[in-house]
Amino acid sequence: MFTRNLAGFAVVLALGACASAPADGPNLGRQVAPDEIAAWDTSIMPDGAGLPSGSGTAGQGASIYAQKCVACHGENGKGGTALALDAKGPIISINAAEKTIGNFWPYATTLFDYIRRAMPWQQPKTLTSDEVYALTAYVLVLNRVIGENDAMNATTLPRVRMPNRDGFILRFPDKM
């Protein structure tokens, strides 16, 4: 019994010594600067929290679209190799219509966030905030959600009411 207690005491003593020893390691990495974190923290909420400064109109977006988007999405958002960007009509049921931005997406801020993170497909995250606002405005005009002269920015974009905003059912409303 004494031997067993002695062995247990030795293990506890060894673990205690290891816990107080300085951590010697490969010293990899470095402290991340706040501006580096800010560059990666690009989340945009449906209410517009996180939207950057800048602005754009559909007219500006049309010229950017012609340069950077038409190859995949086609003229006026139709006929390209990628999904169509304009609404073909309201969604009556899950299978009744093709899901597009105008008839399915619940928030315009989600469109901005998606364009900013994922487009253009061959060079994602290369658009400026002004270009993203302009392209967002252009796509919203294609879907007849906003007027051609409406400017999109951090104030106006969250106010855009998407046609299908209320078309989603909360699965767990008590968790909201």
Where are these regions (language model features)?
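The canonical Cys-X-X-Cys-His
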Residues: 61, 65-75, 135-139
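N-terminal Sec signal peptide cleavage junction
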Residues: 18-20
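Bacterial N-terminal signal peptides that target proteins for export
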Residues: 1-9
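Flexible coil segments in periplasmic/lumen-exposed cytochrome c-class electron-transfer proteins
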Residues: 122-176
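Stable alpha-helical elements in mature extracytoplasmic
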Residues: 36, 57, 107, 111, ...
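Gly/Gly-Pro-rich "capping" loops immediately C-terminal to redox-active cysteine motifs
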Residues: 78-116, 120
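Electrostatic cytochrome c docking/interface patches
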Residues: 27-64, 120-123
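Sequence context surrounding c-type heme c attachment/ligation sites in exported
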Residues: 30, 59-67, 78-79, 104-108, ...
